UniProtKB/Swiss-Prot annotation:
It comes from Akkermansia muciniphila (strain ATCC BAA-835 / DSM 22959 / JCM 33894 / BCRC 81048 / CCUG 64013 / CIP 107961 / Muc). One of its GO terms (molecular function) is structural constituent of ribosome. This is Small ribosomal subunit protein uS19. GO terms for biological process: ribosomal small subunit assembly; translation. SUPFAM superfamilies: Ribosomal protein S19. The gene is rpsS. InterPro entries: Ribosomal_uS19 (IPR002222), Ribosomal_uS19_bac-type (IPR005732), Ribosomal_uS19_SF (IPR023575).
Length: 89
């Protein structure tokens, strides 16, 4: 079940403040955030985020195709260790 339309998308207020500060200063550094649940809005297009992925931060460059998704979708939290290959039993 999705979020109610009357509520609108969730975006962290701290994250919005960081984005506004960066747009005013013209700085192009990545924005560090722990808010994986924040929805990507059209204002985010062209910005780079460092999204917390458990132990480290994943670099996420936002494009138009990402609008409507959440930041956490683009920062995987698990590392796949390959299953057995040649010589493994």
């Amino acid at each position: 079940m999705g979020r109610s339309l009357k509520k609108g998308p969730f975006v962290s207020q701290k994250l919005l403040a960081k984005i506004d500060a960066q747009l005013e200063s013209g700085d192009r550094k990545p924005i560090k955030t722990w808010s994986r649940a924040s929805m990507i809005t059209p204002d985010f297009v062209g910005l780079t985020f460092l999204v917390h992925a458990g132990k480290n931060f994943a670099t996420v460059y936002v494009t138009e195709n990402m609008v409507g998704h959440k930041l956490g979708e683009f920062a995987p939290t698990r590392v796949f260790k390959q299953h057995g290959g040649i010589g493994k039993k």
